[in-house]
Amino acid sequence: MRALWIVAVWLIGVEGSVVELGKMIIQETGKSPFPSYTSYGCFCGGGEKGTPKDATDRCCFVHSCCYDKLPDCSPKTDRYKYQRENGEIICENSTSCKKRICECDKAVAVCLRENLQTYNKKYTYYPNFLCKGEPEKC
């Protein structure tokens, strides 16, 4: 089942290290990334057009912007390590890129937790064609 979840998330287009990001999201929100966030709104799971639908979707927009600031890194493939201390995610200091990718993923997981009250099931599996126009600048 876990392998199926990982493959499904990867195919849908979640960026970053799928395993680590997925664990962070589960730990912070209590929600499984698939299906909760893999195609939520206009920015969670890809797409990246139009305006974020709510604060949850905005978390994914900001996450995409964070990755955009790492042009010399490979956030889709670089795996990193982190641990939790006193309920907080601590990114390990392996390489500069891996640490910065981890910090981007940590930020989105915390943002999703802080905005759980805005999560709206009507934006799960939101049709990408409804996301029109250029996104705002990061």
From Swiss-Prot:
Its main location: secreted. Monomer. PANTHER family: PHOSPHOLIPASE A2 FAMILY MEMBER (PTHR11716), PHOSPHOLIPASE A2, MEMBRANE ASSOCIATED (PTHR11716:SF9). The lineage of its organism: Eukaryota, Metazoa, Chordata, Craniata, Vertebrata. It comes from the Eukaryota. It comes from Echis ocellatus (Ocellated saw-scaled viper). Expressed by the venom gland. GO terms for molecular function: calcium ion binding; calcium-dependent phospholipase A2 activity; phospholipid binding; toxin activity. Residues 121-133 are annotated as: Important for membrane-damaging activities in eukaryotes and bacteria. It is found in: Secreted. Disulfide bonds join 42-131, 44-60, 59-111, 65-138, 66-104, 73-97, 91-102. This is Phospholipase A2 homolog. One of its GO terms (cellular component) is extracellular region. One of its GO terms (biological process) is arachidonate secretion. Residues 1-16 form the signal peptide.
